[in-house]
Swiss-Prot record:
Catalytic reaction annotation: L-glutamate + ATP = L-glutamyl 5-phosphate + ADP
Binding site for substrate: S54, D141, N153
Top-rank lineage group of the source organism: Bacteria
Residues where ATP binds: K14, T173, D174
GO molecular function terms listed in the Swiss-Prot or TrEMBL record: ATP binding; glutamate 5-kinase activity; RNA binding
Protein's recorded name: Glutamate 5-kinase
Amino acid sequence: MRSVIADSRRLVVKVGSSLVTNDGRGLDHAAIGRWAGQIAALRAQGKEVVLVSSGAIAEGMQRLGWTRRPREIDELQAAAAVGQMGLAQVYESRFAEHSIQTAQILLTHADLADRERYLNARSTLLTLLRLGVVPIINENDTVVTDEIKFGDNDTLGALVANLIEGDALVILTDQQGLFTADPRKDPAATLVQQADAGAPELEAMAGGAGSSLGRGGMLTKILAAKRAAHSGANTVIASGREVDVLSRLASGEAIGTQLIARTARMAARKQWMADHLQVRGHVVIDDGAVEKLTEGGKSLLPIGIVGVQGAFARGEVIACLSAAGREVARGLTNYSSAETKLIQRRPSGEIESVLGYMLEPELIHRDNLVLV
């Protein structure tokens, strides 16, 4: 089996906290130097690389003299702010040894949820790659609370892969890859060398939590691979402890777990909608509407809606749930939540008589709807 990285031109590489820190006692300058060297080698092969790096909070803890990761959000944000200084400095100096310029980019999920900011971020990243710069990306933990508590850089790596239409996402961790079961508990567990991204059985295999320094367990990596597949990006989950792992993957050596994107690449606009991590609201739809959306490729009409959850405005991304609560699709709504409550279960011909106007006959047009 040949590594998919060998034939990939544009890569997103995510490096976890444990691979760039001294067990939480600040940044490991030597390790970061090795990553810079391997990425420089990939660049020499004509590959474009965007690096998503953890480590800011761990570095901030070291600089502030903290031995335990704080639980308070404001202290986590303070550590991130202090640590980002050191993280940027080390990467800049190590890549400079290879005559490579770096750029620091701090993103939040909100940046990628807003269409205009999303396109601006994409334009900036593509320009940096064209100029031969290696972008170093991290979540902007200093100003965001939800991401510190629940977010992870695996997901961010997948979002960036979709943003720049990367060929592959490489998630480097302190584990060998995905196993059929937890190898710490099951001696019969074997490494999954290759599977389809998004295969349902993968989520059942992926268990366990991340280390005390990082936030992402194996499940987040599996879900990240599923998300990256939206843009056709394959994913490799491999151990960053393997010597020259990036160089070996680029040479075609199969290391870790390969998750292949089998689904057709989404159109850019639909991909952006699918990548929304936090939708504004939900509509519950009946079984007939579920069938029309999933099998018929139809638009969502008001008559198929049986419930409205949350508050949303026209033009915002909302999720469509089945009666069982499973997300079926998401898309841009033509009506606000207040308007939707008035027209639900009604045929489109009655919209004007209920509201006094009709913007569109559909709640979500099929061109603005994506299955998930």
